[in-house]
């Protein structure tokens, strides 16, 4: 059975891929139109605005640019006739002549209904499409603050979904403890404590400055380090109350550099199971437990093995790396209807093996979307794993970006790369 969030996963992936595609496109001149329409905007007002832009664009000096811009505006106005009102989140039109090979151009059109509401009406005509407003919608919503500290070093960072981001790493100038007795020893101890206090103040300032602008979005803050320094730092007034209130727990970790942040996340994810990184870890561990079995257990990996299992409705869980960037090309012979599927664009146009007729390209399918469709049809649970976490990197690098856990073991269970 598919979880409800699976559909959100694939929608987010499709949205991300669309922005990647748009970011690669450029025009010969300022010929690419980006039109953002909020959900509460009247279509009639948008059309009136475009008519004004059409009139203004008629004065563009360059004949080719003028022709292309006017054609793009006309195309958008024609498409708007099919809408009485904008969709619930509004929509964005990307229209214009994009550069192709040599000095050639071709008309390009893409309409996107974003995952979050468009808040501002915007019209831009430029040499590239304006994507800033949409890219903010891809920013990770699951944010945690991270601090690791001892008397020698501290590191402050964020956990954005499954990606660890270092804000700052600072070294202290606190000297080691003085072991000799006498008055000079007590004076030296006071100097040590003064230096430690200044160091903690500095770390607190870094943490406050990093976390306060995002305090409403931060789900929790994790504080870690070796020994009792973390407890002392937490109990004193180095952190603002708003930051201190977000501290979920304190953890013992062995390091206070970037590796300490990774260790802190590891410890936190073990105790807080609703974190995205915890879910991905659990999913990958389920697959790895099967892989480690002498007979491979219920685990399979490799494209063909997974496709065969999906077609036989044997897959219980399918894991796909978000970092996979492949396209499946399907060609068909116009005479005998024979088909050929390739996972990369061929250097030479394929011909039919039966009669030598040049084949026709009939489909270009995104690899992840195609696998997702097969899995959904077979009733498998699908999870798209980010390539930022250690588990995600393992899936992509060691298993080719796709892995599955079967419902039952088949006799010919062979792992294929």
Curated annotation (Swiss-Prot):
Compartments, as annotated in UniProt: Cytoplasm
Coiled-coil residues: none
GO cellular component: cytoplasm
Molecular function GO labels: translation release factor activity, codon specific
InterPro entries: eFR1_2_sf (IPR042226), eRF1_1_Pelota (IPR005140), eRF1_1_sf (IPR024049), eRF1_2 (IPR005141), eRF1_3 (IPR005142), Peptide_chain-rel_aRF1 (IPR020918), Peptide_chain-rel_eRF1/aRF1 (IPR004403), Ribosomal_eL30-like_sf (IPR029064)
Matching Pfam families: eRF1_1, eRF1_2, eRF1_3
SUPFAM superfamilies found in the cross-reference section: L30e-like, N-terminal domain of eukaryotic peptide chain release factor subunit 1, ERF1, Translational machinery components
SMART domains: eRF1_1
Keywords in alphabetical order: Cytoplasm, Protein biosynthesis
Family: Belongs to the eukaryotic release factor 1 family.
Function: Directs the termination of nascent peptide synthesis (translation) in response to the termination codons UAA, UAG and UGA.
Subunit structure: Heterodimer of two subunits, one of which binds GTP.
Name of the protein: Peptide chain release factor subunit 1
Organism: Thermoplasma acidophilum (strain ATCC 25905 / DSM 1728 / JCM 9062 / NBRC 15155 / AMRC-C165)
Top-level taxonomy: Archaea, Methanobacteriati, Thermoplasmatota, Thermoplasmata, Thermoplasmatales
Gene coding for it: prf1
């Amino acid at each position: 059975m598919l979880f409800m969030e699976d559909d959100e996963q694939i929608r987010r992936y499709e949205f991300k891929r669309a922005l990647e595609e748009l970011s690669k496109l450029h025009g010969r001149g300022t010929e690419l139109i980006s039109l953002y329409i909020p959900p509460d905007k009247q279509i009639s007002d948008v059309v009136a605005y475009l008519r004004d832009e059409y009139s203004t664009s008629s004065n563009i000096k360059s004949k080719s640019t003028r022709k292309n811009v006017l054609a793009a505006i006309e195309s958008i106005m024609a498409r708007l006739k099919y809408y009485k009102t904008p969709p619930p989140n509004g929509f964005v039109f990307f229209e214009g002549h994009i550069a192709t090979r040599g000095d050639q151009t071709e008309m390009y059109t893409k309409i996107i209904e974003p995952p979050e509401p468009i808040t501002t009406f915007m019209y831009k005509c430029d040499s590239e499409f304006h994507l800033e407003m949409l890219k903010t919608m891809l920013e990770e919503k699951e944010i945690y603050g991270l601090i690791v500290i001892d008397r020698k070093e501290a590191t402050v960072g964020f956990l954005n979904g499954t990606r660890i981001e270092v804000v700052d790493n600072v070294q202290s100038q606190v000297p080691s403890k003085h072991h000799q007795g006498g008055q000079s020893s007590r004076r030296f101890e006071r100097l040590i404590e003064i230096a430690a206090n200044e160091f903690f103040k500095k770390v607190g300032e870094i943490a406050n400055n990093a976390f306060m602008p995002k305090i409403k979005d931060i789900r929790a803050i994790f504080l870690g380090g070796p020994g009792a320094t973390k407890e002392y730092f937490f109990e004193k007034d180095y952190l603002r109350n708003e930051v201190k209130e977000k501290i979920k727990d304190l953890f013992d970790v062995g390091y206070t550099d970037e590796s300490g942040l990774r260790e802190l996340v590891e410890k936190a994810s073990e105790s807080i199971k609703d974190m995205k990184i915890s879910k991905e870890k659990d999913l990958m561990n389920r697959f790895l437990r099967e892989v480690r079995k002498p007979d491979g257990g219920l685990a399979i990996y490799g494209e063909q093995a997974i496709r065969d299992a999906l077609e036989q409705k044997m897959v219980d869980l399918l894991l796909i790396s978000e970092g996979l960037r492949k396209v499946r090309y399907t060609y068909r012979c116009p005479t005998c209807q024979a088909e050929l599927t390739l996972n990369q664009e061929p250097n030479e146009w394929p011909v039919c093996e039966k009669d030598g007729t040049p084949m026709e390209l009939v489909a270009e399918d995104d690899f992840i979307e195609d696998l997702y469709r097969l899995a959904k049809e077979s009733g498998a649970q699908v999870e798209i794993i980010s390539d930022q976490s250690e588990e995600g990197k393992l899936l992509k690098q060691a298993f080719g970006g796709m892995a599955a856990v079967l419902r039952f073991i088949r006799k010919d269970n062979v792992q294929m790369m």
